Amino acid sequence: MALKQRINDEMKAALLGGDRFVGDTLRNLRGAILDEEVATNKREQGLSDEEVEKVIAREVKKRHESVRLYRENGREDLAGPEEKEIEILSVYLPEQMTESEIEKLVAAKITELGASSPQSMGQVIGAVKSQAGNSADGALIAKIVKEQLNK
């Protein structure tokens, strides 16, 4: 079953089952997916599962940032619901790579590409992202590539 269809089905089930929080969270996600479809002119054919995963990852990242800001400002009452939304949305993301797995992949790509200076950072990041897909955070990849190229 396509990821977008699974999200729609689970949203309906949550709303019919009386779990309003989950239903509303998935409804907001569905809106973000629709926005992406419109922005990329893919309203007719829809987004691929990989593109939907990117939208979900972006939504999770927004919520992580919100939690951080709420905690910095002492608003635990607002951070809690955001964390629940992160848990709900994370179910639809692929298993995330650990930092050590990313480090191994980066080291392999640096060797494969023969990169030796920070000028090749973009090339290495692109190669790692293309292999890792949505299972690795782009910021973490960039940080690790930068560290390894500056050794």
Model segments located where?
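Charged, compositionally biased, marginally structured helical/coil segments
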Residues: 1-151
